Amino acid sequence: MNIGLIAHDSKKALMQNFCIAYRGILSKHSLYATGTTGRLIEEVTNLKVHKYLAGPLGGKQQLGAQIAQNDIDALIFLREPSNPKPHDPDLNDVIRMCDTYNIPLATNLATAEIIILAIDRGDLDWRELYR
């Protein structure tokens, strides 16, 4: 499966810890992330991550294009809901695209864990039918 990873600055350490905890599962899949998030994940896990540009420099749009082409099977986007960012409209577009294309989306740690465990069990294998 192709898994997208995005994290606001205040959630990047949480994303790193999540990827450390689920490294065994993530290592079986292709990972895609915005630039800084991807680099930070690679540093602590040694997982290979396809890195787009940094989020504010167009990485969100690159990931969004991959969602629109049905090339992402799940997106984990750890965001800071109480501190809006100037580029949040771009992220809202990514969230909307996940809804449009039936891409499972986690925006917090609890749902991220549910999605990653579902992937490991094969619960999201139905995504293969969409390709």
Regions from the PLM with identified roles:
Residues 95-115:
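Short, acidic/small-residue loops that bind anionic groups at enzyme active sites
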Residues 30, 47-57, 126-129:
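Short hydrophobic/aromatic-enriched beta-strand-loop microsegments
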